[in-house]
């Protein structure tokens, strides 16, 4: 079995693959202070709950945008899984032609999403990942990673409103009913969601013009992808496991 880690700024997602099938997954909080043993206890408990034997893990691959967590996770893999993990970064085979000015600056999550997007949906395409930051990545007709845009995530935007406006409460991110709202909470939800939908549609519209290609597919992933995609005009597919799939594909490329 293959254990994959997608480590984001807020959460990390773990998945287990048997061949090309995702058989288990878990979402936990990314904690920069946790030691390898603390992660070992937490992950072992998750495995036990779902009857997963840690000794059945054959290999591990990690994608992380949080450098401070890598040491603990790598030590967890060595101590508890008895495996040296494959880490997405410079020198790893991805099969991706990156056209960035400095390819080393491209986040591991964006590379992994691009690999999965091309494999599953083809090119040209735009990949949107709704995480702590929302990333938009453009893939050319030739399957090249051209670059993209990074915007503040919707939760960051909502939290900034709460933190900066003393009389406004923290609100749940929920689908609004209308824009002419009758309460402060619904007014904030409407402004946050519809405002963010406008941001997404506008960036995708401009990116499509810059790609100058026919039939550009737009694929969204991330925790809030379904909520935003249901309101946009521009997202074609929502794939909640795009990053995990990309990790599996990259792992397989590095076994060839």
UniProtKB/Swiss-Prot annotation:
Show the CDD domains listed in the entry. ASKHA_NBD_PanK-III
Catalytic center residues: 109 (proton acceptor)
* Reaction equations catalysed: (R)-pantothenate + ATP = (R)-4'-phosphopantothenate + ADP + H(+)
Q: Where does substrate bind?
A: 100, 107-110, 184
**Pathway(s) where this gene product acts:** Cofactor biosynthesis; coenzyme A biosynthesis; CoA from (R)-pantothenate: step 1/5
Q: Which residues cross the membrane?
A: none
Q: Please, which domain of life does this record's source organism belong to?
A: Bacteria
Mind telling me which InterPro entries this protein's record contains? ATPase_NBD (IPR043129), Type_III_PanK (IPR004619)
Asked if the record carries the keyword Manganese, the reply is no
GO MF assignments = ATP binding; metal ion binding; pantothenate kinase activity
Nucleotide-binding as a keyword of this entry, yes or no, is yes
What is the enzyme's class at the highest EC level?
transferase
Report the subcellular localization: Cytoplasm
The free-text cofactor remark is:
A monovalent cation. Ammonium or potassium.
What subunit structure does UniProt give? Homodimer.
- What biological function has been recorded for the protein in this entry? Catalyzes the phosphorylation of pantothenate (Pan), the first step in CoA biosynthesis.
Write the protein's name: Type III pantothenate kinase
